[in-house]
Structures are given as structure tokens and as C-alpha cells.
């Protein structure tokens, strides 16, 4: 079994750019940014429970990273960058810490490296279970209307929230709930030590208005790019800024 993805081919000899979306997104999420890099081959992946991979269920991060590796093999991707937002960034970090063959580097936008104590994990598990129950049982428009009121999305205006609620409500609530629980921060290991000891290139992107993740970025041994005029979802709020940062990263 492999994950559903859309592949766009560029010039031979350059590494692939493998894009991983955030929770409730899909393979289209990164395409405005990715298509600015037409010289590179691009793979836009649907994570389990989402888009064309909605029927794929997983029990945890090991299943997700295993499916991702099988997907790369199926496309004969031998050299690649992982580029992930939020959940996709966490998947990218988890996969990269396993040091797969052919990995050139990782670019993470607003991805959490992991909680650091049992109390934080217990609280996050309670919260994610409550959200998962709502995703399973309530209309998605109502759930996402509340989802985008969370502090991490404070930089969004009302129009941006309405647009996101409409877009995300096309998902399957049950499969979102399953993926939310399987990849909760409550079950993700703290990756800080692994990332500090890494052998791959590691870059971090965060919006200038995303105070939570700017603080987290400061804890990581990563080259951090702050995206102007953007909050947590920087590639949606300022795609040109993310394109500029990614172009700078890929030039090295």
C-alpha cells in the first residue's frame, strides 16, 4: 500500500521536493508554492485520512513514515527534500530522524518537535480526544468554526476563517478523527535531541505573527526563516514569502 500523491516532473538530476500538508489539508495545499519550482520534480502527498488517502488508516507515526517511504520508492525517488506544514512538518521530522537514504534535507513550517513531559502529553491527549469525538459526530462546518478559533490561528481574520472552514469541511470527519488520534502530539516523541544530532540539512519556517512557533523554533538547532505578514499557516497567508525562503534554501 502507498499514499495517494500527485507527481510533477522537472529537470533530471535535481532532487525531488516532497510536500506534506497539514491536518485537514490535502495534496493541493502546497501547490501554489511548489509550482514556483518547476525545475524540480514535485510530489504532493495526501497523508492518511485525507484526500485520496482518506481510506488509509494508521496506528501511529511509524505507520505513516513507513507508508511515506514506500510511496517514495514507488515513484523511484532517490534524492529528495521533505517540505511539511504543521502535521506534515511533524511527519517530515519523524521520517528524517530515521535518516532514510537519499534525504537531502527537511524544511518544516510550523511543526512541533514534541512535548517534553507527561503532564503536557496527558493534557494534549484529552484535548485531541475531545476534538476527535466532535469530528466523528458533529457537522464539520461547526467543528472547524471552533477549530479556527484556537489561539494558534489568532492572526486569521473573519474572511480567512470562513474560507478555511468551507474548504476543510469537504473532509471525512471519521477519517480525520482517526488520524488526529494516531498522530497526536501526545504520542509523538520529543525530537529535539535527534534533531540536534542530525546529519541532514534542517530549516524551519514560521510566520512573524505565530509567536508560539517562533518560540519553538528558537529551541531547535535549525536555520529559521521568519515569513513576514503571516501567522501559523504562512504558505497560505504569504505564499510569495515562503517561495522566497524556499528558493534561498535550495540555492545552498
UniProtKB/Swiss-Prot annotation:
UniProtKB keywords: Lyase, Menaquinone biosynthesis
Reaction it catalyzes: 5-enolpyruvoyl-6-hydroxy-2-succinyl-cyclohex-3-ene-1-carboxylate = (1R,6R)-6-hydroxy-2-succinyl-cyclohexa-2,4-diene-1-carboxylate + pyruvate
E.C. numbers: 4.2.99.20
GO molecular function: 2-succinyl-6-hydroxy-2,4-cyclohexadiene-1-carboxylate synthase activity
Gene: menH
Subunit text: Monomer.
InterPro entries noted in UniProt: AB_hydrolase_1, AB_hydrolase_fold, SHCHC_synthase_MenH
GO biological process terms, semicolon-separated: menaquinone biosynthetic process
Family stated for the protein in its record: Belongs to the AB hydrolase superfamily. MenH family.
Pathway(s) where this gene product acts: Quinol/quinone metabolism; 1,4-dihydroxy-2-naphthoate biosynthesis; 1,4-dihydroxy-2-naphthoate from chorismate: step 3/7; Quinol/quinone metabolism; menaquinone biosynthesis
Gene3D superfamilies: alpha/beta hydrolase
Species this protein is from: Escherichia coli O1:K1 / APEC
Pfam families in the cross-refs: Abhydrolase_6 (PF12697)
Functional description taken from the UniProt entry: Catalyzes a proton abstraction reaction that results in 2,5-elimination of pyruvate from 2-succinyl-5-enolpyruvyl-6-hydroxy-3-cyclohexene-1-carboxylate (SEPHCHC) and the formation of 2-succinyl-6-hydroxy-2,4-cyclohexadiene-1-carboxylate (SHCHC).
UniProt name for this protein: 2-succinyl-6-hydroxy-2,4-cyclohexadiene-1-carboxylate synthase
Amino acid at each position: 500500500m502507498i499514499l495517494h500523491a500527485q507527481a510533477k516532473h522537472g529537470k533530471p538530476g535535481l532532487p525531488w521536493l516532497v510536500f506534506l500538508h497539514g491536518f485537514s489539508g490535502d495534496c493541493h495545499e502546497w501547490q501554489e508554492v511548489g509550482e514556483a519550482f518547476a525545475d524540480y520534480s514535485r510530489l504532493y502527498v495526501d497523508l492518511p485520512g485525507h484526500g485520496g488517502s482518506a481510506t488509509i488508516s494508521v496506528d501511529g507515526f511509524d505507520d505513516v513514515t513507513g507508508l511515506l517511504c514506500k510511496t517514495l520508492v514507488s515513484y523511484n525517488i532517490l534524492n529528495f527534500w521533505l517540505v511539511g506544514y504543521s502535521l506534515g512538518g511533524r511527519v517530515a521530522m519523524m521520517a528524517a530522524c530515521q535518516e532514510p537514504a537519499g534525504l537531502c534535507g527537511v524544511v518544516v513550517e510550523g511543526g512541533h518537535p514534541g512535548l517534553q513531559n507527561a503532564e503536557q502529553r496527558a493534557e494534549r491527549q484529552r484535548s485531541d480526544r475531545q476534538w476527535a469525538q466532535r469530528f466523528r459526530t458533529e457537522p464539520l462546518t461547526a467543528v472547524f468554526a471552533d477549530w479556527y478559533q484556537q489561539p494558534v490561528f489568532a492572526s486569521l481574520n473573519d474572511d480567512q476563517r470562513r474560507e478555511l472552514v468551507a474548504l476543510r469541511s469537504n473532509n471525512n470527519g471519521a477519517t480525520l478523527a482517526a488520524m488526529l488520534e494516531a498522530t497526536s502530539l501526545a504520542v509523538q516523541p520529543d525530537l529535539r535531541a535527534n534533531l540536534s544530532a542530525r546529519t541532514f540539512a534542517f530549516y524551519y519556517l514560521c510566520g512573524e505573527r505565530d509567536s508560539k512557533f517562533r518560540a519553538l523554533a528558537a529551541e531547535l538547532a535549525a536555520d529559521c526563516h521568519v515569513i513576514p505578514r503571516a501567522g501559523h499557516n504562512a504558505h497560505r497567508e504569504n505564499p510569495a514569502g515562503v517561495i522566497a525562503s524556499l528558493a534561498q534554501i535550495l540555492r545552498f
